Amino acid sequence: MLQENCYVVNDETKECVIIDCGAFWEEEKKAITQYINDNELVPKHLIATHGHIDHNFGNAYIYEKFGLKPEVHASDEVLMNKLNWQAESIAGIHLDYEMPPVGKYLTAKDTIQFGNQTFTIIETPGHSPGSVFFYCEKEHIAFSGDTLFHNSIGRTDFEGGSKFMIIQSLRIICQLPDNTLILPGHGEETSIGKELAENPFLDR
């Protein structure tokens, strides 16, 4: 719907996590379940980098298919409680179904475990109060949501956004190794090193 990137991440154990399920159209939803079924994956978590509707359109579908409730940072509780309102006010879409309740509100002390993998949670407020990076140190990968993009950063003019906070968050994530692959919520993949070299908003 809003050209948002959804990720299904698995390892050799076949356990997987679904990140930022913004699937709105039926073909998008079916593509996710087909990938999971074709690869005989076992979904363990449905996680969101933040509480905006474009990253959560598919939550009801995933809950119906796999029984997973979304997990999101606690600071985005307000946003998660009004996803249907967001759909109407931001995307002009009336959803004729209710979203599932949040299964767990996350903090920086939590980790996401599946298979042999562990994601740590880096709090990156600014685009929204509860924006996070999901960081896998073992694989040198970070899922950045709408905080960091190739040559750009997230907007801060939405409810709860803060330009000051996103700048503080960028200073933190700049400390990740240069070879960290960044998989954003929109657009193409990049890396910390590339963004430090090319992104005008980043500076160590």
Predicted regions mapped to residue ranges:
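Conserved beta-strand hairpin/beta-sheet module of binuclear metal-dependent hydrolase folds
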Residues: 1-39, 133-145
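Short, basic and Ser/Thr-rich N-terminal targeting/leader segments
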Residues: 2-3, 73, 99, 128
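Residue-level marker for buried hydrophobic side chains located in beta-strands
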Residues: 17, 47, 70, 143, ...
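Short catalytic-loop micro-motif centered on adjacent basic/acidic residues
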Residues: 18-20, 45-48, 121-123
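Metallo-beta-lactamase
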Residues: 23-24, 87-89, 111, 117-204
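Active-site HxH/HxHxD metal-binding segment of metal-dependent hydrolases
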Residues: 23-29, 33-112, 197-201
